[in-house]
């Protein structure tokens, strides 16, 4: 049993400390690395309105003669307040914790307390994964038995599939045999868009990305890094000039968009963000600890009409 190995002090991070933890993890997220646009201070439903102008030049004449077109597109972003309430037995993690701390000590390092280790190495890592999962895949109509947190809002994929202006490509179960063709089909739709597609990325699930690599390997001898319409530069693969990005988007889903078109909203100022870990042994006599976290997230798309998404598989 784990009890009596150590005396644990409860951990509470709130106010500025909690804000710093929250923001630090946001900016170390893979989403930031993808180039997703971050928008702070989203306290309530917020309108995202953007405009473009075109057809500006005309033949010179003396009088002022208005000419040109302005196109407005609006969408909304709304924050969702989320929380974590977790109770776990120390025994579930104690052996791993002791092994890690022994390794640290033998290497001349300073061992962590159990709560600090659990918070930094277990809790935060899982929170980052689920936060990214929410960003891409949240769906208020979700009915799955796992990942129930996806019901908390509507993520990027749900919003794009429901937007009248976005371009849809029929979704299929992606396999090694068809993944290159389906990525090519999405890329072809991007080329049909009227806007500048410089900087666009194609987002796919990690598993589908590996299928793509396998398919490329089957279509290329030796170590050639250039295929028909696909190239490799270092660790990155480009399809039709666009980087293919593996991420936590659901399997069999492809989204093509400029990453700055996709918004991750949040609020830290005057919010209720907090992180707490409480030892229950002196309170309930159970050999457990509780974790309580309050956070928030908002997802939005500025220009749905400039994005391409595969439809849900029927």
Where are these regions (language model features)?
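Sequence/fold signature of self-assembling virion shell proteins
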Residues: 2-56, 150-174, 211-314
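Assembly/oligomerization interface modules of large self-assembling protein complexes
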Residues: 18-100
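Helix N-cap / beta->alpha transition motif
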Residues: 85-93, 100, 205-208, 257-259, ...
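Active-site-proximal structural scaffolding
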Residues: 86, 116, 202-205, 284
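Short helix/loop capping segments that flank catalytic or ligand/cofactor-binding pockets
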Residues: 96, 132, 211-213
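Alpha-helical scaffold segments that mediate packing/assembly in large oligomeric complexes
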Residues: 102-185, 310-314
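Extracellular structured ligand-interaction cores
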Residues: 120, 197-199, 288
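Ordered core of a single globular domain
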Residues: 174, 180-220
